[in-house]
Amino acid sequence: MKNYQVAKTLNEPRVELKEALNLTGCEVSINELPANASVPFVHAHKQNEELYIILEGDGELFIDGEVIAVGKGEAIRIDPEGKRCFKAGKNGIKMICIQSKKGSLEQYTMSDGVIVDDVKPSWL
């Protein structure tokens, strides 16, 4: 059994990766809204915080009654209770959304990574 899975993510307005990759610790989606389009609802979560990473374009984020401008290169974290909705700007918007249970991160990067010496690629 392989220790990895690969999924195609091209040419879809929304791709959810939980099922495609059998994710067990987070939900990841890639979302694209055309020019001036909006998510058709406001939502919050019961447990999951969300991290949005804007890949292309710009738009507006309605969050708890406030509207803020968002654009390429920005990352936005929202608590589960935050009431949110995105609207694309005149050039559309493409973003990654990562959901995970608030407060669940116990190890990360240097505290979770382990250097492996018994196998390596040809370029090392």
Sequence positions of predicted segments:
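Conserved short histidine dyad/triad with adjacent acidic residue
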Residues: 14, 29-45
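A short, N-terminal "cap"/entry segment at the start of jelly-roll beta-barrel domains
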Residues: 1-26, 108-124
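Ligand-binding loop in jelly-roll beta-barrel domains
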Residues: 80-105
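Glycine- and acidic-residue-biased ligand/ion/polar-headgroup-sensing regions
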Residues: 47-49, 53-59, 64
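Short acidic-glycine-tyrosine-enriched beta hairpin
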Residues: 65-81
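Well-ordered beta-strand scaffold positions
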Residues: 26, 66-68, 91
